[in-house]
Amino acid sequence: MSEAEAPREAPLLEVRGLHMHFPVSEGIVRSKVVGTVKAVDGVDFVVRRGETMGLVGESGCGKTTTGRCILRLERPTAGQIIYDGVDMAQVEGKALRDLRQKVQVIFQDPYSSLNPRMKVGDIIAEPMYVHGIEPDAAKRLARVYELLTVCGLGPRFADRYPHEMSGGQRQRVGIARALALNPEFIVCDEPVSALDVSIQAQVVNLLEDLRAKFGLTYLFIAHDLSVVRHLCQRVAVMYLGRVVEQADSDTLFDMPLHPYTQALLAAVPIPDPMVEQGRDFRPVRGEVPSPINPPSGCVFHPRCPKAVDRCKQVRPEPREVRPGHIVACDEVH
């Protein structure tokens, strides 16, 4: 989907200079900090109201940790998370509780994210009970039936336990639970990666239908680039805790500029054998460096085919090389 088709509203979410560092300790009795995992190390991006923003990268790049910081499941080490004018990194107590009604999550694993001891109806109704938005039990149940129907299941599933359902059905329950509080913004943390391929398209189409129906805004975290291209208006690419490229979906997939983005897209198989044989595939050399001791300068330089001496010393700052196309690489002009 092109930038021209994307919503033009002001940003609903703005992430500025986000850092999330975890201490590494050793010892049992007298444990001491011996290092720091820089899971997120200076991330900036915006999400406009009504759009789906993709956040992609290899496993361990920090995309899920970024999502957890936005949800305030983790307290950021530094930076700002401006949601509708309020810095979520700083709020506490009732203010944070109120914001969490507006910001919800769909978890990656539809098996471990549902309580096996609770019936589906109780799982979906629990957020309403906790936040006190629908104290009447009969109205809560009616809302549960409505959400189950909207998510393609139906009221009969309310009395089932999670183990009686398939993976796709469980993920629909997770989606219904995320909708229970009438949120504005949903973090979708790889919501289809644990599902069969035959079910993935159904869930992706459901998410798109719900976005249009309820005016939702998504941060869609994923590593399946074909799903991201189908669903997202804009995409940010992360590598080792940093965003290396941002652009609208069509531009990023058709004209990637950062060497890492180019390598990611080159690794996606093409179903046409003739096209697959004819393209220039250059796999990324080496291994992903440790986030405990990341490389100096550009974190991608040890694996980059375009790296020069400057890349080893100077961390590239994100800059707009074309309208709406931001790249963190000094060798891109």
Regions found by a protein language model. Give the residues of each.
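Charged, flexible cofactor/metal-binding loops and thiol motifs
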Residues: E3-P11, S25-S31, D248-H333
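ABC ATPase NBD coupling module
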Residues: V29-V34, M88-Q104, V130, A137, ...
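Conserved ABC ATPase "signature" region
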Residues: V86-D87, A138-R156, Q262-A266
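A short, proline-enriched helix->beta-strand linker immediately N-terminal to the Walker B motif
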Residues: A180-E184
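P-loop NTP-binding/switch modules centered on Walker-like glycine-rich loops
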Residues: V187, P191-L195, I199-Q277
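Conserved ABC ATPase signature
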Residues: Y161-M165, Q169
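Conserved ABC transporter NBD signature motif
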Residues: G79-D87
